[in-house]
Amino acid sequence: MIALEIYVSGNVQGVGFRYFTRRVARELGIKGYVKNLPDGRVYIYAVGEELTLDKFLSAVKSGPPLATVRGVEVKKAEIENYESFEVAY
């Protein structure tokens, strides 16, 4: 298991990006959360197996139909215990 902090920039707020991310994460069994940041980016904290997180990152880089992803920054993080994947506010 590994944990990642993911920062997504572009047109990613107000276009269903967080709910898209939650759906994909739950389908893949990834734990953590997603939230909007005040600077217009989306922050994702994700815990899972490395291969599963690779699939997740591919989906995040594409985003939902109305989103335009311009950048994705990924950092390794400390593993925290989450029961599920949620949208944080």
Swiss-Prot record:
The gene is acyP. Its EC number is 3.6.1.7. InterPro entries: Acylphosphatase (IPR020456), Acylphosphatase-like_dom (IPR001792), Acylphosphatase-like_dom_sf (IPR036046), Acylphosphatase_CS (IPR017968). It holds the Pfam family Acylphosphatase. Belongs to the acylphosphatase family. This is Acylphosphatase. It comes from the Archaea. NCBIfam families: PRK14435.1 (NF011009). The active site is at R18, N36. Gene3D superfamilies: 3.30.70.100. Keywords: Hydrolase. Disulfide bonds: none annotated. It catalyses: an acyl phosphate + H2O = a carboxylate + phosphate + H(+). One of its GO terms (molecular function) is acylphosphatase activity. Residues 3-89 form the Acylphosphatase-like domain. SUPFAM superfamilies: Acylphosphatase/BLUF domain-like.
